[in-house]
């Protein structure tokens, strides 16, 4: 099935509002296995909308119009669609009752004749009730093409799509199932290069890479009639990806840290800390509390996070973390020594299972002979202390700070997984 989205509204063309409905609808239709081929925006003009409908009816099986269902003169979507299909507009009984109820409870509101337009649908259409507004939607099939009209405000469109439109479209359609693999430690260009054969030869399932700040995701998608069928197909493809080696010989399996569109390294660490009953603290210099704030984002953070330190100056590192000032001056704040002592000091002072520390050069200027993006990350547990050095080149100050926290979370994640393997 080929689908097309038509956004109706001059305010979209003039840039007054962003057409977020297109993204939402495209994603929802993709989940149903319905392919969206065209996005169109047209102003509040009957002749231009008629022209767009004529074109759409010749190239698409499903045409969804968004916006223009309100009471004003420039809300002309239903009227124009009715004219295009050679049909009349009729009143939907349920939508009319909703109008009656709305104005009955608001005696100060004047019910002008144009308000009645919101309760109209194209003759022969199945109404799509508006759960959060007054303008009724509708769905109708004429000469093999299905037309849908939806309200423009996202607060009205989304509930109508989720609770009214999707059930109407799901009959006799396969569903698109997706699985998102999340990677840390490999760039998009290298990842695409090493799985090039899988991407070039893809049919079903498909692979779509997405680069995010500091990490990469792969969305694996397949059309199937059930979750079980989809899992079988996606499992095969995932195993092929996991068995691939990076250019320096690492297994991609070791670089996958989790699944899901909304997952994150921070959440994986939070989950593992709770799972193993461990606690963590942090001492931060260049990241200024960003690591700690990320942990605190999750409900129940107090179970795993005892508190932390933000120590920008050398003097505060010495005073708050118990590091001899002379040693800090000797080694410098941007060093393995300082990262390790910060991690150890924070862990001891809070009696936590893990201490993590970040110190380095956020930029744009160099510091102590180290280029911008040079970061040392220390990690301490009850038995040992160690640190890593990373260089995050060609990034803004905010990106350096954010990516530094990703490295820190990954370091903690690896430590927790090693502890699990030793049990």
From Swiss-Prot:
SMART domains: MoCF_biosynth
Pfam families: CinA, CinA_KH, MoCF_biosynth
Source organism, top-level taxon: Bacteria
Alphabetical list of InterPro entries matching this protein: CinA (IPR050101), CinA-like_C (IPR036653), CinA_C (IPR008136), CinA_KH (IPR041424), Competence-induced_CinA (IPR008135), MoaB/Mog-like_dom_sf (IPR036425), MoaB/Mog_dom (IPR001453)
Family annotation (PANTHER family): NICOTINAMIDE-NUCLEOTIDE AMIDOHYDROLASE PNCC, NMN AMIDOHYDROLASE-LIKE PROTEIN YFAY
Stored HAMAP family: CinA_B
Family: Belongs to the CinA family.
NCBIfam families: cinA_nterm, molyb_syn, PncC_domain, PRK00549.1
Name of the molecule in the record: Putative competence-damage inducible protein
Gene source species: Streptococcus thermophilus (strain ATCC BAA-491 / LMD-9)
């Amino acid at each position: 099935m080929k689908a097309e989205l038509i956004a109706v509204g001059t305010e979209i063309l003039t840039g007054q509002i962003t057409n977020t409905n297109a993204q939402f609808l495209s994603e929802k239709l993709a989940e149903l296995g319905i392919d969206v081929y065209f996005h169109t925006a047209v102003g509040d003009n009957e002749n231009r909308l008629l022209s767009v409908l004529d074109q759409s009816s010749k190239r698409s099986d499903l045409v969804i119009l968004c916006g223009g269902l309100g009471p004003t003169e420039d809300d002309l979507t239903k009227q124009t669609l009715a004219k295009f299909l050679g049909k009349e507009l009729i009143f939907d009984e349920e939508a009319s009752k909703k109008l009656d109820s709305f104005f009955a409870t608001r005696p100060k509101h004047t019910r002008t004749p144009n308000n009645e337009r919101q309760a109209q649908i194209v003759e022969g259409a199945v109404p799509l009730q508006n759960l959060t507004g007054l303008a009724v939607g509708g769905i109708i099939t004429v000469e093999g093409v299905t037309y849908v009209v939806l309200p423009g405000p996202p607060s009205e469109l989304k509930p109508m799509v989720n609770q009214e439109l999707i059930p109407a479209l799901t009959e006799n359609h396969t569903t698109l199932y997706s699985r998102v693999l999340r990677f840390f430690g490999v760039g998009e260009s290298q990842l695409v290069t090493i799985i090039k054969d899988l991407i070039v030869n893809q049919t079903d399932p498909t692979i779509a890479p997405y680069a995010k700040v500091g990490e990469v995701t792969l969305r694996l998608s397949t059309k199937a009639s059930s979750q079980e069928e989809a899992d079988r197909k996606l499992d095969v493809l995932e195993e092929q990806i996991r068995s691939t080696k990076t250019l320096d010989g690492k297994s991609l399996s070791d670089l996958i840290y989790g699944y899901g569109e909304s997952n994150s390294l921070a959440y994986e660490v939070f989950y593992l800390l709770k799972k193993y009953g461990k606690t963590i603290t942090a001492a931060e210099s260049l990241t200024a509390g960003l690591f700690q704030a990320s942990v605190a984002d999750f409900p129940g953070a107090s179970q795993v996070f005892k508190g932390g330190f933000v120590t920008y100056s050398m003097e505060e590192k010495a005073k708050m973390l118990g590091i001899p000032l002379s040693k800090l001056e000797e080694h410098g704040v941007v060093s393995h020594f300082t990262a390790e002592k910060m991690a150890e000091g924070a862990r001891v002072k809070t009696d936590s299972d893990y201490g993590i520390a970040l110190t380095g050069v956020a930029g744009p200027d160099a510091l102590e002979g180290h280029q911008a993006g040079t970061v040392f990350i220390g990690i301490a547990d009850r038995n040992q202390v160690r640190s890593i050095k990373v260089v995050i080149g060609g990034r803004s100050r905010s990106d350096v700070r954010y990516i530094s926290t990703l490295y820190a979370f990954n370091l903690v994640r690896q430590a927790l997984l090693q502890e699990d393997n030793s049990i």
